[in-house]
């Protein structure tokens, strides 16, 4: 087991390149979801702290040491941060697991991905220098035009607790690469590693105010950030109701937002798959990785009727083989959910499904060997109909619901029977069928013969109530750039639109 005695640093808010105590001096306890014990606390920012952070960010943009940097100069900072993350990987991964309940294996993988994301956007920052000014050919000899790509300005980044540092970096890295000054507001349920990012930025000498980190409650810190008149954009990942509130606040100022709001993603399994075990493992990974706390989790299994019995038998055996334990234990593959509130929410979904007539095929309660912690067994629910809550609503926990189908048309109808549109997966060796499903799925992300692989180079985002805008890839960088048209009149001839006045 990893060392659970790693000390929890007692940080303040990271504003203007230094640690600052919150104006109201309040703090929020940190609860280890594996033990239910308080292991530390984080500062609780309020509107007053948001004002200070916004001012620090605006000063950073106005100063030459950040506001006038080239992409190549910003890339050096991003690469320095990446190197520090890898240097501190072991401690950061342990802190992440203690804070959020993620398995240590997943937390360590997240740190590799964090460093990789900074490296990726360092490359895009360098490439931005040659793209900053792009000439545009016009059908006119009298004008010369070009397009400028410029940083949007001060951006607010509000991020979730399920991948605390990684999903923060999906926004921080491109924002800094673009030359924006950012204010990061992570979830109060898991903020430790985001605060440690502040220490890393201090250590590598990131110009003050380029990145500011405010921990605290959503209404007290996130709300004032979203509605602040001097914040030029909000990028948010989280729940639908909170996303709606952010849109409402931003709308008053006609402020741009990008939103990633979760989903109820399907995985469709056809009878022509070559190997039941391969398909079963991908199905499990799609819903039980990160304890099911994944916005794109393929939480609805739609399996062809004539293989359903055999496939479910294999799926059940794989599920019962998952090691559930303290997330710091070696080979742990499923830890606790993040909080008491999330624990009660997941169990309520399971209870409601049973009350509505569904069958709890396996799981559905606390593992018997774990008396403390917010643990929920990996759960598979069958005999589900499309009117049930468990079919329609995002659980955000280790819960898979199952339906069968006979025809492709039925499978598509079931797959798209959701208000969300983030991800979808299809398992089949028929290439043409996979192409048909790629076109038919009403989602922003499609996986063929897999579920959940994620790459820095590819766009991440959805349709319908899963939100709009894209993280990652070149699209993630464009989120934080403003396009400015510049046109010059180059002819010596007068415009000749108005009648020239007499010279007398």
From Swiss-Prot:
CDD domains: ALDH_F10_BADH. GO terms for molecular function: 4-trimethylammoniobutyraldehyde dehydrogenase activity; aminobutyraldehyde dehydrogenase (NAD+) activity; betaine-aldehyde dehydrogenase (NAD+) activity; gamma-guanidinobutyraldehyde dehydrogenase (NAD+) activity; nucleotide binding; protein homodimerization activity; sodium ion binding. Pathway: Amine and polyamine biosynthesis; betaine biosynthesis via choline pathway; betaine from betaine aldehyde: step 1/1. It is an enzyme of class 1 (oxidoreductase). Its EC number is 1.2.1.-, 1.2.1.47, 1.2.1.19, 1.2.1.8. It comes from the Eukaryota. Dehydrogenase that catalyzes the oxidation of several aminoaldehydes. Metabolizes and detoxifies aldehyde products of polyamine degradation to non-toxic amino acids. Catalyzes the oxidation of 4-aminobutanal and 3-aminopropanal to 4-aminobutanoate and beta-alanine, respectively. Catalyzes the oxidation of 4-(trimethylamino)butanal and 4-guanidinobutanal to 4-trimethylammoniobutanoate and 4-guanidinobutanoate, respectively. Catalyzes with low efficiency the oxidation of betaine aldehyde to glycine betaine. Belongs to the aldehyde dehydrogenase family. This is Aminoaldehyde dehydrogenase 1. It comes from Solanum lycopersicum.
